Structure formats: structure tokens, C-alpha cells
Amino acid sequence: MDLKWDDFFNDYEWLIVFLKGMVKPAAALVVVLLAVILSYSQNLSLEGEMIYSVSRSFLQLSVIGFVLQFIFNQENSGWIILAYLFMVSVAGYTAGQRARHVPRGKYVAGLSILAGTSITMFLLVLLNVFPFTPRYMIPIAGMLVGNAMTVTGVTMKQLRDDIKMQLNLVETALALGATPRQATLQQVKRALVISLSPVLDSCKTVGLISLPGAMTGMIMGGASPLEAIQLQIVVMNMMVGAATVSSITSTYLCWPSFFTKAYQLQTHVFSSD
């Protein structure tokens, strides 16, 4: 049986291109080797974790690259929803892990992230800022979900910790007739300020200290810097909006876990460290 080499190379041309493109990432392992050597010389015992982390990131990015290539070739809007829901699920689980002492924290985080990011993307698609295609929406959703995940996790953890620290103050306010919202108003404000501050600081310094990923990618891809900043401005605005909606939503969804229907604190929630 004769092997048709032309057909073989045509069918697997994408794989050959991929393997050729991996030469530069492989060369970049030199700096990882440097980090491993420094860790060993300083007795940090991080060599194994460094190698595992880099290997895992390589595997994850390679897999997602092939998945995205497949999705982009389909030109089917349904894949946007599936990819988005998968990202929200992983983000909700991760944020819930950070706020592990909040009952049903993973569901609270997931719903909060879903609310913040879906509202933001819906508005911008409605305004025709981005076309509703996989090539645009999936990368944008990834940036928004990742940012909302961090902010939501910090908000939930900080709110629970602040209420625990000021438990007597909150209980006194409840005893005097305050609602859960009134009794925890200061704690909610503090949690939101702490969680949103990094996002706002990033907006203040964008372009001055570092060039964001979306802008850098477009410039390296050959786009005009002026075109790149237009996209980055939109992305930064979306991140602020999604993070704010997600974090505020999480505070509302946390209350049923913190208080009974009779407006009493669920003391067992705050007893664990």
C-alpha cells in the first residue's frame, strides 16, 4: 500500500506549523531553567513546583489553542455560550475556594461572575462594539471572567472576615432593629473598596507602567498602536463594569448565608478560621 505523502502533509499541515512554532516557546525555557537553578541554590525547594507549573501551563495552553482553533472554524454562536459557561464554572469554583468559609461560596461566586460578565458583554454587543462571533467574544469573555473571578473571591472573603472581626458590633445593630444590609453596611463598603482598588489602580496606570495583554498582542500582530489602544480602552471599561457588578452581586448573595430569616447571624459561619 503506497503512502500518499502529499495527502499526509496536507492533512497534518496544521500540526507541522504548530510544532515549528513551538521552537521559540521551547527556547524560552532557558529562563525557567535559570529560575530552577536559583531556587536550588537558595534552598527554596520550589524546583518541582516550578517545573510542574510550567508543564501544566504548556499543556493547558496547547489544549485550549486546539480547542479555540476548532471553535473558530465552526463559526457557530453556540460554541460561544458553551465556552463562556465553562469559564464561569471554573472561575466560580476558584473564587469559591478563596472564600471557602462562605457557605455555598462556589455557587455564590459563579452566579455573581455570571451576572457581571453577561450583563457587560450583552450591553456591548447590543451597542455593536463587538460582533457576536467566537473569535471576538471568547477571548473577551476570558479576560472579563478572569478579572471578575479575582475581584469576587476577594470581596466574599473580605466581607466574611470583616463581619467576623466586628461580630459584636453587627449583632448590636441587629438587636437595635437594623436590617442585615444596614448592620453590615460598613463591612460591605470596605470589602468592595479593597477588592475593586486593584482594578481601578490598573486603569489609572495602564499604558504608563505596562502595556496590557490585548494591546500588546495586537501591536505584536502588526496592528496600528492607535487601533490597539481603541480595543484596550474598551476592554478596560468592560473589566471595570463586570468587576463592579460581580462584586456587588456577591455581597447580596452572601447575606442568606450570613443571616437567618429572622435577621440573626449564622454564628457557625464565623466560628471557623
Curated annotation (Swiss-Prot):
Q: One GO cellular component from the entry?
A: plasma membrane
One of this protein's GO BP terms? Answer: response to aluminum ion
Keyword terms: Cell membrane, Membrane, Transmembrane, Transmembrane helix
Taxonomically, the superkingdom here is Eukaryota
Induction per UniProt is:
By Al, primarily in leaf hydathodes and the phloem throughout the plant, along with the root cortex. Regulated positively by STOP1.
Specify whether Nucleus is a keyword of the entry. no
> So which residues are the signal peptide here?
none
Additional record remark = ALS3 transcripts are mobile in the phloem sap.
State what this protein does. Answer: Required for aluminum (Al) resistance/tolerance, probably by translocating Al from sensitive tissues such as growing roots to tissues less sensisitive to the toxic effects of Al.
Name of the protein described by the UniProt record: Protein ALUMINUM SENSITIVE 3
Question: Per the UniProt entry, what species is this protein from, by scientific name?
Answer: Arabidopsis thaliana (Mouse-ear cress)
